[in-house]
Amino acid sequence: MRFLLDAEQRAFADSLNALLTAADTPPVIRAWATGDRTPGRALWSRLADAGVFALAVPEAYEGVGPLPAELAVAFIELGRHGVPGPLVETVAAAVLLSELGESGSAKRLLPALASGEALATVALPGGGPFVLDAEAADIHLTVDSPEAPTRDTTPPARLHLSGSGSGPTGSARPSLDPARHLTLPHPTGELLATGPHVTHAAAQALTWARLATAAQSLGVGLALLDRTVEYVKQRTQFGVPIGSFQAVKHQLADAKIALEFARPLLFGAALSMAPADVAAAKVAAGEAAYATARTALQLHGAIGYTAEYDLSLWLTKARALRTAWGSPAECRAEVLTVHGPRSTDSAVSGGDPRS
């Protein structure tokens, strides 16, 4: 099966690429990392005008979705240009509110997410212990459970809503990517819903978050590869470009193959939206981007990891996205629940828990 974009999807990708190229994102990323949100919010509004956030919002709430394939197209471009902010989290929040089946909360919050008026951050079971950019978000959603799960029962989940300035306030956790600000979630504020439907909605939101992260990772990897190819054409050694050396060509070819193998997995997952398919796509894209980052750093040499050099903005993001919304080991475990051996012992022995 071939997963090729149609003309409309290609035009959408081209328009986003042109928008983000004109925006010159490296200064925006650096400003966001220092806490200056003004350039980032301005770019966020332009992305919303292009329809990016409306892709996860149903038409009934002023969106155009749900359109997971188009969302994947958009997030590849967002990753390619390193756009900062709670992009994935806003999508996950939109899906969470849409899947709840509670029209009151959806009508109140979803139009603002679709239009870009509001940024959201969200904490979900299975999504990791931290929330992203809580201090910049206007909407904070936290799903938790009042009881610990047992072997035979899953307690009902609760969804809490808090607004700007009243969300997670715990001490920040340093991230390898300076543009990602992490804090611990605190389930406080208005109780929007409780019950099994919250658990279901949270699972759907997690799947969308992993899909968007996979697409973002693929875009980051493609950007790293493109920048490295250009660099090895210019950097000379022994009087010739280092890109002419066979060893360099092989490393770049390996990176290209890994990224292109991840692409059909991503779009296949966007068509099925099966949790195991999405988890497989996230592993493939995340590992391909991380491997490309290592190759890019090696071929650039010392200049590659200097903070002043733009390549570092993508190097750190590739590493951070690799474990965001599910580590490689967690995503592989998700795949094994459907496609792996029946035995838990066999499943555990089949993967590296350190990955």
Predicted segments with their positions:
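Alpha-helical interface subdomain recognition
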Residues: 1-79, 207-355
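Generic beta-strand or strand-like secondary-structure segments
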Residues: 73, 77, 92-96, 108
